[in-house]
């Protein structure tokens, strides 16, 4: 992520700050999704990821479009995972967010290496959906691997609800990715601009 422009650095710092502070801020004011779902009587393991997965996908795809750097996914994903491990040390399943960010970073590299994909809002939106879906899937995988027996029993006992949360995360991430593409069009890096625009053809 070297040789970034000043405005790219500012964007990166701002989104990194949001990624690492949003959970503790929401926790401090009583609006953490897990608490909200619990108060509404609809709590379910992993359900908050249908909020955080698409939200992070939206932010990271916008930053990806702004900087043209695939590393924004694993770098900010790592920082977010570290932040969550300090705020919620008992919830080791948050390590799944790191795995999702690494895989999404690899997908972002593939997008950059294929000009047709990089210039397609559809592929960029699907990248956001992929990250949001992976965010939820990896959370569930890490919960099954490291979580409590009670959590595992609830998740495996309600497969349709679990799948619904995963699919919902993917769909919301895709929609927010499309919105991010529209919002970032005036600011996007040249690699994402159609050839006719970039070369004045």
What kind of feature is each model-predicted range?
Residues 2-71, 105-113, 181, 185:
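Hydrophobic transmembrane alpha-helices
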Residues 9-14, 54, 70-78, 95, ...:
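Hydrophobic alpha-helical transmembrane segments
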Residues 15-23, 106, 173-181:
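Hydrophobic core segments of alpha-helical transmembrane domains in multi-pass membrane transport
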Residues 16-25, 77-89, 129-140:
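Aromatic-anchored segments of alpha-helical transmembrane domains
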Residues 27-32, 36, 79-110:
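Interfacial aromatic-anchored transmembrane helix boundaries in multi-pass membrane proteins
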Residues 28-32, 37-45, 119-201:
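Membrane-embedded alpha-helical hairpins and interfacial helices in multi-pass inner-membrane proteins
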Residues 62-75, 114-121:
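Membrane-helix interface "capping/anchor" motifs
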